[in-house]
Amino acid sequence: MNLFRKKSLGQVHPGLNRHLRLWDLIILGIGAMVGTGIFTITGTAAANLAGPALIVSIVIAAFCVGLSALFFAEFASRIPATGGAYSYLYAIFGEFPAWIAGWLTVMEFMTAVSGVASGWAAYFKGLLANLGWRLPTVLNGTFDPAVGTYVDLLPILVMVLVTALVLMNAKAVLRFNSLLVLLKFSALALFILVGIFHLNPGNWANFAPYGFGEIYGGQTGIMAGASLMFFAFLGFESISMAVDEIKEPQKNVPRGIVLSLLITTVLYILVTLVLTGMVPFKDLNVEDAVAFALRQVGAGWAGNYVSLVAILTLITVCISMTFALSRMIYSLARDGLLPKAMKQLHPKTKIPQNATLVAGSMAAIAGGVFPLASIASFLNICTLAYLVMLAFALLKLRKEHGAPGPGEFKTPLVPVLPILSIVVCLSFMTQYSLSTWLAFGVALLIGIGICFGYGYGHSEENK
């Protein structure tokens, strides 16, 4: 049994249509990253973990993600294949490590989509509450019999809509996604412009109420805030999962990843700075923090606009991540590690239809049953684990194949940056609770079971 059989470096699979340009990739990345994190998580993280110093947490999280983005950019330019970290590790470490990375990526995007759907539901409920409407209790929250909630209906309904959209022509869907991203920017720009006139510098006086926190094992403070805000940047790697559909991938993928990450970081810092300046940070422990802050300063009209736009545009994150998740499942099935039905393409649109249906169904179930806070921590730890693997893979790539050639993206300061990334990611992982680690362990065991129960025996490498 050879668990470490490899694919050749740069092996590409035809089949999908190449139609995505640099602008499409930037919009895909921003659409995935600017969502629940900026509309919801910023408020709860400021209230419970870092206070106004959350802007420092964001810079730390962005730095960590930025390191990994550089690695993704180099891999994408040297190994142009759909599947992201999974495909890169397949070429460097072999099948079993690649499967672990691929499985963790599926877990990441499945929980990310469901988390965003939950954030969308929170804003929609807030808007309904302002109109005096409320869903029946049994359908108005994730599973918690003690308070009478059993399923959150709204995240399930929005995932049905998103799945239907992603099953349409991919180019048309991403054009629609671009329009919604621009609408999202209009709401955030309005928030910043209105918020500037309602800033109270006294709200920043207690800048770091929870301190810096512990480098390893902390539960509050700037580092704990950074570990949670890591959630905000997840999705940048979605670009590398659609390489087979990108024009000039070796040039456009690195540019798309870096540019979308830079734009997103600036936007998060501005919004968090204004948010914590408008309202005392302790009051921000709400699920619709941006709209809530506007209503607190008497700008209810702007708060309602932000709520409406959030309802419309959080769908962009669901679209971007469902798009990426379906391509990840397709990649695993194409290599024989998941049932071959998952690699079936629609004869006309060339969209992996069964993989898309599975992706949407898993996200709908998770969003309807699990609370947002537990979703965010679980997907973060899954992502951090495979980013550690990716950093090790870059070190091995450079050792065995040397520096990138002409026209390929080159990560600077190797091996310093990969080693630094490993240290930072491991530090973030220690910030999570025992229950998060248990969920991570169970997910790993399930993934290993699928690998040995199905994947190894059906792998294309057997042929």
Describe the function of each predicted region:
Residues 1-43, 47-52, 65-70, 82, ...:
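Membrane-interface "cap" regions at the ends of multi-pass membrane proteins
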Residues 11-17, 55, 132-153, 179-308, ...:
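Helix-loop-helix junctions that connect adjacent transmembrane segments
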Residues 16, 147-151, 341-353, 387-437, ...:
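C-terminal membrane-solvent junction of multi-pass transporters and transport-like membrane proteins
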Residues 17, 41-145, 260-263, 440-448:
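Extracellular loop-to-transmembrane helix junctions
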Residues 17, 22, 152-156, 247-255, ...:
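Loop-to-transmembrane helix boundary motifs in multi-pass membrane proteins
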Residues 39, 104-122, 228, 233-246, ...:
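Membrane-helix boundary/coupling elements in multi-pass transport proteins
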Residues 44-50, 54, 105, 116-122, ...:
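Transmembrane helix-loop boundary segments of multi-pass membrane transporters
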Residues 104, 121-124, 150-201, 257, ...:
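Membrane-interface loop-to-helix entry segments
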